[in-house]
């Protein structure tokens, strides 16, 4: 099964194993994921489902989104996400609700979310450069990156050069996190380790691609 779920990060806590060891976990609240659209090989060239979760006032929707939800007959959510289907996956119908039962305890998953933005950061913070001398003639270049290139040849700065810039606030996938607990009553996933994003951030949880 390749489909995943969209949940919200609640924060981190820890649980204890039978041996008494503390395990750090991220708690993800998964509201029902409602299928808004089913894509097929015949009409779209590939198989996938489009889901939404949560709720959103109709007055906050664009006309295009309002029409899309109305056509499907599904309550508007806070966003739209798509999951590709494999040939072995079952067929889904519009309006189907998916929950934490999609996953099993002990299963490995990939978690994708938008990382916390850190603003404009220098190379020491952003790329872990070491600082230059604090003294011995160094007056202005304590946290400077140093040389960023050569001379007239090649006469440019190469792409990918690590420099100061905006840090964080980008989509990050953390692979191979193990589900150590599922609370079906409260629709919670307990995932071992840290997941990107702030509290309340949308997290896409998929079966691990490399397990």
UniProtKB/Swiss-Prot annotation:
The keyword Cytoplasm does not apply. The keyword RNA-binding applies. GO terms for cellular component: cytosolic large ribosomal subunit. GO terms for molecular function: rRNA binding; structural constituent of ribosome. SUPFAM superfamilies: Translation proteins (SSF50447). It holds the Pfam family Ribosomal_L3. PROSITE patterns: RIBOSOMAL_L3. The modification N5-methylglutamine is found at residue 152. Transmembrane segments: none annotated. Keywords: Methylation, Ribonucleoprotein, Ribosomal protein, RNA-binding, rRNA-binding. Methylated by PrmB. One of its GO terms (biological process) is translation. Residues 134-155 are annotated as: Disordered. InterPro entries: Ribosomal_uL3, Ribosomal_uL3_bac/org-type, Ribosomal_uL3_CS, Transl_B-barrel_sf. Belongs to the universal ribosomal protein uL3 family. Part of the 50S ribosomal subunit. Forms a cluster with proteins L14 and L19. One of the primary rRNA binding proteins, it binds directly near the 3'-end of the 23S rRNA, where it nucleates assembly of the 50S subunit. This is Large ribosomal subunit protein uL3.
């Amino acid at each position: 099964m390749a489909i995943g779920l969209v949940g919200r990060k609640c924060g981190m806590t820890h649980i204890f194993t039978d041996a008494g060891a503390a395990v750090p976990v991220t708690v993800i609240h998964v509201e029902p994921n409602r299928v808004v659209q089913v894509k097929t090989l015949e009409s779209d060239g590939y198989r996938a489902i489009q889901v939404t979760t949560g709720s959103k006032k109709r007055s906050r929707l664009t006309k295009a989104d309002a029409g899309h939800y109305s056509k499907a007959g599904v309550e508007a959510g806070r966003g739209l996400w798509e999951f590709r289907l494999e040939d072995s996956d079952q067929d889904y119908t519009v309006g189907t609700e998916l929950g934490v039962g999609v996953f099993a305890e002990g299963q490995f998953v990939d978690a994708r979310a938008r990382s916390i933005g850190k603003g404009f950061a220098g190379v020491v913070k952003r790329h872990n450069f070491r600082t230059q001398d604090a003294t011995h003639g160094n007056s202005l270049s304590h946290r400077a990156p140093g040389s960023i290139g050569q001379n007239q040849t090649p006469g440019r700065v190469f792409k990918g050069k690590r420099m100061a810039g905006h840090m964080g606030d980008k989509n990050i996938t953390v692979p191979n996190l193990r589900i150590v607990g599922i609370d079906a009553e409260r629709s919670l996933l307990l995932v071992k380790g840290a997941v990107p994003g702030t509290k309340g951030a949308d997290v896409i949880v998929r079966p691990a691609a490399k397990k």
